[in-house]
């Protein structure tokens, strides 16, 4: 499959770019986490260390993979692709549990730091990285992984990029493999949050002022969420744009146990899930041949 490798820029990536620039300053791993860690998991504090940062990822990997039916034994022979690895918060745990891991991100500097993080807290011999240069396509061959995992990443992409990455996930997954993809959908607060986000992203485009705003936590949290996608929107796109010879089965939409979620697409199981943000939902599915 041929891909367009021309780089594209998305304004909501500005905080990641700013954080990525700071990872290249030569500071220690702990200093980098204190300066940029909140971009990935909202943790802050002058005493935050890389080890603390990775421990939060270890816990979430354990919890989510258990909820999705993947214990350590089930992962031992699997190659996992992580869309949106950042500097390796969750990647380290994946390398300790899986046969091999491919970490991808829109920022090449993050991938360099991811390699360093895994070197300290994971198994770097199992890791390779791939830059998502255009924000929408994976520079990987067809049928090369068993699991595609993405958490708190697709919501920061442009809508069309997030949908493209969803079908790209299918493309690179082998027959019988699994998709574990996290999205954000509409909640009442979005009536105010989305217009504020649009305004903030416009401010980020202003020279000097924009760069300063993009490194502040409050500004970033307003402007970095670029889309809202319902399960039916994602499933309709996948149905219409599935890679040749592939389809998804065993489709489950997992949503917060504190909310009610309705899915109109036929053949989809809807399940409540504990400890999930009210605005988030997960798509889990098996990739099969047609």
What annotation goes with each model-predicted range?
Residues 136-147:
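A short acidic, Gly/Pro-enriched loop at the edge of an enzyme's catalytic core
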Residues 163-175:
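A short glycine-rich, Lys/Arg-flanked "PGG" loop and its adjoining helix->strand segment in the class I
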Residues 2-77, 87-127, 131-137, 157-162, ...:
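Class I (Rossmann-like) S-adenosyl-L-methionine-dependent methyltransferase catalytic domain
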Residues 82:
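Class I SAM-dependent methyltransferase core
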Residues 78-79, 174:
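Residues that mark the start of a beta-strand
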Residues 79, 100, 144-146:
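Structural signature of beta-strand start/N-cap positions in the alpha/beta core
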Residues 147-160:
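A short SAM/SAH-binding and catalytic strip from SAM-dependent methyltransferases
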